[in-house]
């Protein structure tokens, strides 16, 4: 099957800088999952995957600013069969002084098992995060344990086998999917050129232009550019 990807975007918030970067730099079909809770958006994305037949599906959070270089890098490696799951990577957050955090979203440590009586991972249960400078210094492909929904891409068959879901706490869907990828022995890859700017402010959730519970949830399909001015 020819490489025919689609970008699925979570949109619990209206973050114009992130939205505009996707519209300006990525010319593939897009689906905006607007104003859903995290459990709801997982269910809606799974439904979309089941009911369509794209070759690859890309999961994107709502708070990442994607450059053309990052988008092109991710699509280039996603098309290669040897990389089962490919993901962009991010700064963990932005510090109060406006600088990027020291650490990235890349981790090569083992994701520990979440016990049945636990509702989801605590921050101290994640393996160590690698410094941004280390990631930038790497010239080749990088193994990571976290497909952190920074344009995380895989073939349709992988998503059908491992549907998207949250932990019982209704959060941490990227950790949940990454843990199940690890259990199945499916490797996740990234590259230094796949950097996506993460707009999160510190460790707490960024309640910026929150849509959930304020507007009606909807799924919006957007095709490839016909008249680019329509999107930019």
Locate each region found by the language model.
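Active-site-proximal specificity loops/subdomain of glycosyltransferases
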Residues: 27-54
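C-terminal catalytic/acceptor-binding lobe
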Residues: 147, 156, 161-232
């Amino acid at each position: 099957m020819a490489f025919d990807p689609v970008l699925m975007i979570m949109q619990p918030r209206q973050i114009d800088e992130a939205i505009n970067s996707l519209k300006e730099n990525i010319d593939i079909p897009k689906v905006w999952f607007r104003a859903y809770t995290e459990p709801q958006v997982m269910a809606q994305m799974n439904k979309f995957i089941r009911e369509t037949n794209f070759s690859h599906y890309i999961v994107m959070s709502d708070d990442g600013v994607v450059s053309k270089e990052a988008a092109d890098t991710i699509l280039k490696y996603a098309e290669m069969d040897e990389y089962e799951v490919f993901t962009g990577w991010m700064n963990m957050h932005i510090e109060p002084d406006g600088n990027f955090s020291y650490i990235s979203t890349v981790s090569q440590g083992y994701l520990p098992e979440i016990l049945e009586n636990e509702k989801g991972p605590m921050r101290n249960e994640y393996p160590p995060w690698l410094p941004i400078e280390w990631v930038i210094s790497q010239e080749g492909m990088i193994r990571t344990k976290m497909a952190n929904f920074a344009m995380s891409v895989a073939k349709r068959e992988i998503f059908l086998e491992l549907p998207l879901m949250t932990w019982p706490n209704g959060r941490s869907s990227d950790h949940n999917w990454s843990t199940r990828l690890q259990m199945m022995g499916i490797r996740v890859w990234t590259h230094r050129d796949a950097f996506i700017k993460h707009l999160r402010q510190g460790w707490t959730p960024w309640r910026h232009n929150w849509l959930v519970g304020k507007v009606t949830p909807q799924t919006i399909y957007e095709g490839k550019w016909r008249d680019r001015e329509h999107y930019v």
